[in-house]
Amino acid sequence: MSNIVFMGTPRFAVPILKKINQKYKINCVFTQPPSKSNRGQKFTKSPIHTCAEGLNLEIKTPKKIDEEYEYLKELNLDLVIVVAYGQLISKKILELSKKGFLNIHASLLPKWRGAAPIQRSILNNEKKTGISFMKIDEKLDSGPVCNK
């Protein structure tokens, strides 16, 4: 596979990006735009943004992923790996990848789909949790699960 894009934002996604980057060439990393945080309200880059800079990877931070439709189309995508990216991905973007979009989700789907699955597992005293691999469709965390 030669045309891979990674989409992610939080710290949870950092070791996954690093591991994939060791074995495959990642064409570009998409993450959320820097946001104001802390008392000084300074703009802060996401953990994935900082990691991708350290790995010398190209970075895109669109407010809406559809803004990058033409760019993604030109990449002739083979696979897109998504880890807690924070945006719903439209059908027209999903159709650009030959092998689809693979989501790595921090819960045993279908339980705790959506945002903050780790926190919700803890708050609900789950005895067992894990990670799910699923193909992305147009709905939130509802595509077919490949592995848990």
Where are these regions (language model features)?
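N-terminal beta-loop-helix "entrance" segment that forms/cooperates
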Residues: 35-53
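N-terminal Rossmann-like dinucleotide-binding module
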Residues: 1-40
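Donor/substrate-binding cores of folate-linked one-carbon enzymes
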Residues: 79-148
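Short, structured coil segments at secondary-structure junctions
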Residues: 22, 55, 96-97
